[in-house]
Curated annotation (Swiss-Prot):
It is linked to Defects in NDUFAF7 may be a cause of susceptibility to pathologic myopia, a genetically heterogeneous disorder characterized by extreme, familial, early-onset vision loss and described as myopia accompanied by severe deformation of the eye besides excessive elongation of the eye. Its EC number is 2.1.1.320. One of its GO terms (cellular component) is mitochondrion. This is Protein arginine methyltransferase NDUFAF7, mitochondrial. GO terms for molecular function: enzyme binding; methyltransferase activity; protein-arginine omega-N symmetric methyltransferase activity. It comes from Homo sapiens. It catalyses: L-arginyl-[protein] + 2 S-adenosyl-L-methionine = N(omega),N(omega)'-dimethyl-L-arginyl-[protein] + 2 S-adenosyl-L-homocysteine + 2 H(+). Arginine methyltransferase involved in the assembly or stability of mitochondrial NADH:ubiquinone oxidoreductase complex (complex I). Acts by mediating symmetric dimethylation of 'Arg-118' of NDUFS2 after it assembles into the complex I, stabilizing the early intermediate complex. It comes from the Eukaryota.
Length: 441
């Protein structure tokens, strides 16, 4: 959520609003359990004032306001994760998930020449559980990493979540003095003695040999939604319902909008979602990896350019009408991995997307589960491990709903030599762990 761009759309005038002829309803618009009345939340009041002042807003602007508004945003002050929150992520389900990702980063570090230093950068770290599990693996394999200087860099816009992350990962957080010229708003040392810093924007993270992690990050970036009509593509906007006070509705723009430029000329779907912010971040990651090496690993809900309407809300672990009580529920849209691949623009190689159950099986989740089960004599612990495994791997649960996607230097897949410095002159191994069934055989 670090690189958020405005759509460039000007306000629609009253005449244009009056000309919008139809209402659009997406398949996720209603959960079937919406309340009879729309609770008037502070965010709803804010949005209605904004729309009355400037006209209907894009879905992207709606998502941005609802999730990251500095005063009322869902992500800014809420702890929405875990059993008491609105959704649970893979790291909260099983420690094995983070452990295998830690192994993946070490595998890539070894395969690309064992640099004497690297940065671990996570975008949107949640409660810090995932990076904590990864760091535990780094500690357990300290003999392998003993000659490598590691630092952790977290990109987080939520003050509430950054405080939780600090409690999870450090002995004592050390806030910096508020300095407009400093890109770091908090820093400290992890429980294992690794320097850790917090940023609000990926651009502020120091460039260098880095491994980037984005787990359930891209799915909350604002999307523009478009519907194909007899007149061509028309963007979906959010407007005030003239028939019902304190209620929002979807409408279609009466004419083309600038964001239409993001749609592929040969697009065959009737409804598409595009995320310019995701493209900006992928471009940044690609440039960094091409220049200084490393890799990026993305794990998220998504598809490879096949799905249409995926915009939905979650509240208390249930689907929630995206226009009801804004600010009280998470908003998300599936990641279009084909778009991420295009935005890499050939600067780096890409792998995936592949299903989560395939990636984790290739990473050795079955072996790791057996080791943990053999070590545990507690029935409750064993049951928890098995339930976590089922949630991660079952195709009807997370196994096929989540995908893994990676960005790597071209040399990594070509078996060539890495030319950045002499310390990394060994040929790359062409097999990439997780993306090949041969990875651990």
């Amino acid at each position: 959520m670090s690189v958020l761009l405005r759509s460039g759309l000007g306000p629609l005038c009253a005449v244009a609003r009056a000309a919008i002829p139809f209402i659009w309803r997406g398949k996720y618009f209603s959960s079937g359990n919406e309340p009879a009345e729309n609770p008037v939340t502070p965010m709803l009041r804010h949005l209605m004032y904004k729309i009355k002042s400037t006209g209907p807003i894009t879905v992207a602007e709606y998502m941005k306001e609802v999730l990251t508004n500095p005063a009322k945003g869902y992500y800014v002050y809420r702890d929405m994760l875990g059993e008491k929150g609105d959704f649970i992520t893979s790291p909260e389900i099983s420690q094995i998930f983070g452990e295998l990702l830690g192994i993946w980063f070490i595998s890539e570090w070894m395969a690309t020449g064992k640099s004497t230093a690297f940065q671990l950068v996570e975008l949107g770290p949640g409660r810090g559980t995932l990076v904590g599990d990864i760091l535990r693996v780094f500690t357990q394999l300290g003999s392998v990493l003993k000659n490598c200087d590691i630092s952790v860099h977290l990109v987080e816009v939520s003050q509430k979540l950054s405080e939780i992350q600090a409690l999870t990962l450090t002995k004592e957080k050390v806030p910096l003095e508020r300095n407009a010229g400093s890109p770091v708003y908090m820093k400290g040392v992890t429980k294992s003695g690794i320097p850790i810093s917090w940023y609000r924007d990926l651009h502020d993270v120091p460039k260098g040999y880095s491994f980037y992690l984005a787990h359930e990050f891209f799915d909350v970036l604002p999307v523009h939604k478009f519907q194909k009509t007899p007149q061509g593509w028309r963007e979906v906007f959010v407007d005030i319902d003239p028939q019902v006070s304190d209620k929002l509705r979807f409408v279609l723009a009466p004419s083309a909008t600038p964001a239409e430029a993001f749609i592929q000329h040969d697009e065959t779907r009737d409804h598409v979602e595009v995320c310019p912010d995701a493209g900006v971040i992928i471009e940044e990651l690609s440039q960094r990896i091409a220049l200084t090496g490393g890799a990026a690993l993305v794990a998220d809900y998504g598809h490879d350019g096949t799905k249409t309407d995926t915009f939905r809300g979650f509240c208390d672990h249930k689907l929630h009408d995206v226009l009801i009580a804004p600010g009280t529920a998470d908003l998300t849209a599936d990641v279009d991995f084909s778009y991420l691949r295009r935005m890499a623009q050939g600067k780096v190689a890409s792998l995936g997307p592949i299903k989560q159950h395939t990636f984790l099986k290739n990473m050795g989740i079955d072996v790791r589960l057996k080791v943990l089960l053999d070590k545990s004599n507690e029935p409750s612990v064993r049951q928890q491990l098995l339930q976590g495994y089922d949630m991660l791997m079952n195709p009807k649960k997370m196994g096929e709903r989540f995908n893994f996607f990676a960005l790597l230097p071209h040399q990594r897949l070509q078996g060539g030599r890495y030319q950045r410095n002499a310390r990394q002159s060994k040929p790359f191994a062409s097999v990439v762990a997780g993306f090949s069934e041969l990875a651990w055989q």
